[in-house]
A protein has these predicted regions:
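Non-catalytic terminal/accessory segments
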Residues: 1-266
Length: 266
């Protein structure tokens, strides 16, 4: 519905702005960003055009969401923060998005005090994987490391809360293991497969998600035109290859047999 209502807004903006104004329009559903050469262009040209366009459709600009900011101060869009650092444009996860995932993890761990470690992992892993996948195209490694540490703290507290006295030491031996000499204290638990064999499942680490820079689609490319068939087939193949590589990495690192975990005795 939002696509239908806002259809034509970009054309209307460019119709009334000069090429030298350097006006660009980016939209997803009912969220959009307009950039320009100066703040005056946005105030005196763009905002009046947008306001009039929306008014004709019985809508109005949200005063809460509408603001003019310099690119060096940055802005948030769809959970991303876009900002210029020392002359270089970088896109990172927004602070609000980071706070949101931390809250979700904290609440999930709190709900899971009565669960087994394997059950907690099965609920947390899709949350962790989904968030990390969403931000794998941007500058996210430092954020991934910060959140991995946050998840460790919450699962450590879960273990301490679940067990008391001397049993805490045994719980630490059970729930925190090592993948290698360089990757220790990974929250994990065992499950039994259909053959009754123990298989250890580990909490996913965001740092294991490979950063894959987005390759922009050619602006002139149209998937409905036959001359671009090969181009979109290549993009589709590249996407599948990236997904397969990530799947293999997940399988290797997050579902591990006993002998691959240091210090585990079957």
């Amino acid at each position: 519905m939002a696509n239908m209502v806002l259809d034509g807004l970009e054309k209307e903006i460019h119709k009334h702005c000069k090429l030298s104004d350097k006006v660009n329009y980016i939209r997803y559903a009912d969220d959009f960003v307009v950039t320009a050469n100066t703040p005056e262009i946005l105030k005196e040209k763009v905002i009046p055009i947008v306001s009039k366009f929306l008014a004709q459709r019985g809508l109005s600009l949200s005063q809460e969401k509408t603001k003019i900011t310099h690119i060096e101060d940055g802005f948030d869009f769809l959970g991303f923060n876009v900002r210029k650092y020392n002359g270089k444009f970088l896109t990172k996860p927004s602070k609000d998005s980071i706070k949101s995932i931390q809250t979700k993890i904290k609440e999930t761990v709190r709900k899971g005090y009565g669960w087994s470690g394997a059950d907690l992992i099965s609920v947390l892993n899709p949350i962790i994987q989904g968030w990390a996948n969403y931000y794998r195209k941007v500058v996210s490694k430092a954020t991934y490391a910060k959140l991995d540490n946050y998840i460790y703290q919450k699962t450590f507290y879960w273990t301490m809360r679940k067990f008391h006295g001397n049993t805490r030491y045994k719980a630490m031996d059970r729930y925190f293991r090592s993948r290698s000499h360089f990757r220790r204290w990974i929250f994990s638990d065992f499950v039994k497969d259909k053959d009754g064999q123990k298989r250890y499942v580990c909490i996913k680490k965001m740092m294991d998600v490979k950063i894959q820079r987005h390759i922009k689609v050619r602006s002139s490319a149209n998937p409905y035109l036959p001359e671009y068939k090969d181009y979109f087939e290549e993009r589709k193949k590249w996407t599948k290859d990236c997904s397969y590589i990530q799947w293999k990495l997940d399988k290797k690192l997050n579902v591990i047999m006993d002998e691959n975990l240091l210090g585990v005795k079957p």
